[in-house]
A protein has these predicted regions:
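Glycine-rich beta-strand-turn "strand-cap" elements at beta-sheet edges
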Residues: 2, 39-51, 76-99
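Residue-level signal for secondary-structure boundary sites
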Residues: 16, 60-62, 97-99
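Active-site-flanking beta-strand signature of metal-NTP-handling nucleotidyl enzymes
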Residues: 3-8
């Protein structure tokens, strides 16, 4: 299992628009090959900063299957007008789950 962490800074005043768009985009992720879960967190210290936490079965499910699809283009069309700049994306694997 791979956890994608995407950090997105949203343009000032577009937080509600971004949240509405990302809520609609959840359906796209739900039907994406290998996507296991999708959550969005908003920073308390920096309210214009969001982190998408997306679990994929494999790295390729994200980097090949999803980003090469029309679904990815549809997702980006819903939310990218709200982006302050390009998202920062990192893929992680579980090293320890203590409890």
């Amino acid at each position: 299992m791979i956890l994608e962490i995407a950090q997105i800074d949203v343009k000032p005043g577009l937080e509600a628009e971004f949240e509405a768009g990302i809520a609609k985009a959840a359906a796209i992720f739900k039907s994406a090959k290998g996507c296991r879960s999708f959550a969005v967190r908003r920073s308390i210290e920096k309210p214009q900063r969001y982190r998408l936490l997306i679990e994929w079965e494999t790295l390729e499910n994200h980097t090949v299957d999803f980003t090469g699809s029309q679904a990815w283009k549809d997702y980006r069309a819903m939310v990218s007008p709200c982006f302050e700049g390009p998202p920062s994306v990192e893929h992680t694997e579980l090293a320890l789950q203590a409890f």
